[in-house]
Amino acid sequence: MTRVESNNTASQAPPSGAGTLEQQVEVVIVTGLSGAGRGTAAKVLEDLGWYVADNLPPELIGRMVELGAAADPPIRRLALVMDVRSRFFTGDLSVVADQLRALGLRTRVLFLEASDDVLIRRFGFARRRHPLQSESADGTLSAGIAVERVRLAGVKAAADLVIDTTELSIHQLHRKLEEAYGGGAPAALQLTVQSFGFKYGVPLDADMVLDVRFLPNPHWIPELREHSGQETVVSEYVLSRPGAQDYLHTCHHLVDLTTSGYRQEGKRYMTVAVGCTGGKHRSVAIAEALGELIGADTSAESADVVRVVHRDLGRE
């Protein structure tokens, strides 16, 4: 069921209740070849609700798990990113894994890899040196990659999941990680419907911009001028204008089509900006009405969380 949140996103607290760490926390160790996508994987896991810690010293992991389980809200899903650049990384994750399992935690290891050609291309694009390049025999990028492959061979062999990102787009990697670590359900698609005034500029983060300046402006009606589109007297006026309902439902259909495509591409956030001249009357009324329509939509294409915000309301 779609949830509608107006002006601010409601906080969602995980179920309360005491229990063992095993019941409360699961851990995934994210590692693999440099350039294979660890950073991207960490961002995806964060979007999926995991708390991500980068190169945490092994002696602090157990303490962090305990503190996270006792936090409010508790940290129930912890992703530990570990790579060869860390002075704590030995190439053998058995000590770390044993620590976590001794606490009764479900612990998995994710290993990311890619072909040499792709890794070389990615490093060239980013204009970075490989972290083990200076340790290789001839100091070349390809030699650094070879050293890392040897060093991480045991880690790869012990991993619960190995993902080769050679042919994967970011969105394809997102889907694979969602299948493995999403908890059995797709991550929520969060939609923001934002009203604004064109005279203050179009929102830079807008994925879709709707222009409602074709509707009659309540500003020129003295008894409506001081009211906003959040008030019934203005919203009823705006929504009853010729073409308003057709436009509203057409936009709803367009947003549904777009959110469906966003889901397929692994995207999780979308902002629809609704603009009028000053961001007080027409855009506010249409944004509220569009948010209600999307919020009442139970189809598979609809967003899961809808937030309605008014950027320029009160700015005049």
Curated annotation (Swiss-Prot):
Source organism superkingdom: Bacteria
> One MF term from GO for this chain?
GTP binding
Q: Where does ATP bind?
A: G32, L33, S34, G35, A36, G37, R38, G39
What keywords were assigned to this record? ATP-binding, GTP-binding, Nucleotide-binding
UniProt keyword Transmembrane helix, yes or no: no
Which residues make up the binding site for GTP?
A: D83, V84, R85, S86
Spell out the family assignment given in the record's similarity comment. Answer: Belongs to the RapZ-like family.
Protein name per Swiss-Prot or TrEMBL: Nucleotide-binding protein NFA_35930
Tell me which species this is from. Answer: Nocardia farcinica (strain IFM 10152)
